[in-house]
């Protein structure tokens, strides 16, 4: 009886940890460091940088704190 309870608890914990979609929102890369996009660093170069560090893809978008500045963002590895 106790082993069944522990197996169910283990299953719930693993399913929560392995649920896809938890890291699909764009985040600055690396966290805390904003790479500005502009004439010298385009969306194509941002994508190349992000895929080189192991992320799925990258793109340039307005910065969260300063919307007038465009920053490089990467999608999570999931």
Curated annotation (Swiss-Prot):
Leader peptide range in chain numbering: 1-23
Q: Where in the cell is it found?
A: Secreted
- Which positions form S-S bridges? 37-60, 46-72, 50-74
Return the GO cellular component terms, semicolon-separated: extracellular region
Iron-sulfur is among the record's keywords: no
A single GO BP term for this record reads: killing of cells of another organism
- Source organism, top-level taxon: Eukaryota
Write out the entry's keywords from A to Z: Antimicrobial, Disulfide bond, Fungicide, Plant defense, Secreted, Signal
Q: Which family does it belong to?
A: Belongs to the DEFL family.
Mind telling me what this protein is named?
Answer: Defensin-like protein 281
Q: Which organism is it from?
A: Arabidopsis thaliana
What taxonomic ancestry is recorded?
Eukaryota, Viridiplantae, Streptophyta, Embryophyta, Tracheophyta
């Amino acid at each position: 009886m106790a082993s069944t309870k522990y197996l169910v608890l283990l299953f719930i914990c693993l399913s929560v940890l392995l649920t896809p979609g938890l890291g699909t929102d764009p985040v600055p890369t690396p966290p805390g460091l904003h790479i500005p996009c502009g004439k010298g660093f385009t969306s194509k170069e941002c994508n190349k940088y992000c895929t080189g560090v192991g992320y799925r893809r990258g793109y340039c978008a307005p910065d969260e704190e300063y919307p007038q500045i465009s920053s490089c963002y990467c999608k999570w590895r999931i």
